[in-house]
Each structure stands twice: as C-alpha cells, then as structure tokens.
C-alpha cells in the first residue's frame, strides 16, 4: 500500500499516511490514534471478509455488545459516514508504476426486515430462521478501478448475534465478494492484525503450515538469537506448542511457560512468513520484549519482510524500539534495508484531526535526538 486515508473512524476524525514503505513504524503519545490506524488498515484490506468487525472488536474487548456498530464511528456520530481509502502501486511496466485506489464508505442503516435469504453471501449456519426485527446493519459502498460504478453490500449480525452475514446489492457486488479485487490491490488485499495479546490458537495454525512447507528454519534462527538452547518447534494434536531445549531437558517445554518475549517474537515472525504478499499490522511491536531483544526483532522483521514480500505497519510506545531500529540500519550489513523503512509521528491537533510526519532513515536519528513524540 502506497498511501492510506481515513475519516470518521474510531478515534480518527481525519488522518492521512503517504509514501508508506515496506516496513513502517507509527509512534506518538497515548491517544494519538495509533491502534485506530491499524484497525482502519485492517478494514480496507479485508473489506469483503464478514469477520473484520469481530476481529477489531476483539482488540478492544467489545465482543460482548454484538448489535451496536456505533463504536466504529468517530465520536459515535453515525450521521457521518466512515471513509477509508488505500492507494496501491503495481509492478513496474515499461518504466511506469501503475497506481490504483480502493475506497470504502461505511454508513449505518436501520433495517426492520431482512433481505431475502437467497441473497445471503456468507453465513456459518444456513438454516438460521429469518429475523423479523433485524439489528442495524452497515452499508458498505466500494469504489474500485475495475468497475465504473460503486459496489454495495450490507454487513449485518446473524439472527443469534453470533457471526456476520454479507448481503450483496446486485450481481456485480456478488461477483466482487466471491472473486475479490482484480486490480493491483489484489496481492495486498490480505492483512493480519497482531494485538498485544498472544493468540496461541492462531499461532499453532500458522506454525503447522510453515512446518508442512518446511519453512520453520528461519523462525528457529531468530528464536536462537534469544535462547541458543532451542532446537526445534513441535505441535501437539491438542493445539499445544512445544519447544525442544535440548538434552538438558527431559521433556519438551510448552511455549506458554517461556517468557513473553519468545512468544511475541515467534508470533511476529510466524505472521510475516504465513502472509506472503500481504500486510502484517502489529500493535505495540515491542510488547513483552526486553530492550536487549529489540535488535534481534528488527533484524528478523527486516529480513522476513523482504523474503516474503510483506508490508509491515507497526506501532510502539517506546523510543527504544525506534533507537534500536536506527542502530540496526546503521550497521553496514543492513544498509540494503535503509530505503525500505519509514517512521511516522502521529500528533493530535487542536481540531482533533491527527497529523502524520514522515521520517526516512536519514531523518530518524535527528528526529530521536530532537524529541520525536513517544510516551517516554
């Protein structure tokens, strides 16, 4: 994604990020909107997936209130539509870089009758009865380069409030939901959001896929940078993740008995390797990590992002995370990554819009020395 713009979403009245790099770090004081930016990026990248609402709800512990979409709107003001847009760059063709924009407008719709059951695009339980008093739904209008008219569909809670359903408005909308974007956003139309809480269930699935494809060696190399005893990763049929720490241990050690740093590091690198060609969004990148592990983390991220062609957009509250990134880039062996990195300072203005200030590698050290705005 080359740029991202959002209006009236979560804590963001307005924000724009431009010239996004392969690896991006968002910094700023508390309540500057960093997590909301990640959620907005997640929405636009997963707009045809009916579960994006549940996914971002879970990051805020809002899943108990399953019939209220108002928390998605800035200031809970549903009279103004949410606007999200992402600009994507394609492969260079004849010295030109094709650019296209995917835009989405979300508004609240008060409905009292369901659309015909045959129009339901996705639902977990097809025999769920009609609900004569359906809750509010979200009307989503998409503008994409491959069609000349907007595409529209509704997101609505199911009868039992357990999952989301998508209702296409017409055949073009149905085709888009089934096939996805055909233009250059397609390769990046996949995003994974990592919150501050480790999800060992998802991690188990990712590790299983990597082991099947014999791609776990890079994970082990990164983990051994923190603990040289780690020999291999094992998965149990029950979903437990184990680490083999060598002959000094009689049994395999469950991952959840290791420190938070090992879990966090494994979750991040595994997410990158499992989402090749997509976007990985990481909230509080350094959460659970001792500052001494930050160099290991950055080296692993920079290498994996290039290896798997993944765009990284992460947040931090720590100036240490930014300092260690600059120190890693200062090393001559990592000079090739310098053009792949950007940091953005987010500052909430008096009118409550959030302004972003971009720093490339050459500007990072100066920005740190002159008090780039982070919590500490």
Language-model-detected regions and their locations in the chain:
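Switch/communication elements of ASCE P-loop NTPase nucleotide-binding domains
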Residues: 1-55, 249-375
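Phosphate-coordinating catalytic segments in nucleotide- and nucleic-acid-processing enzymes
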Residues: 47-273, 341-376
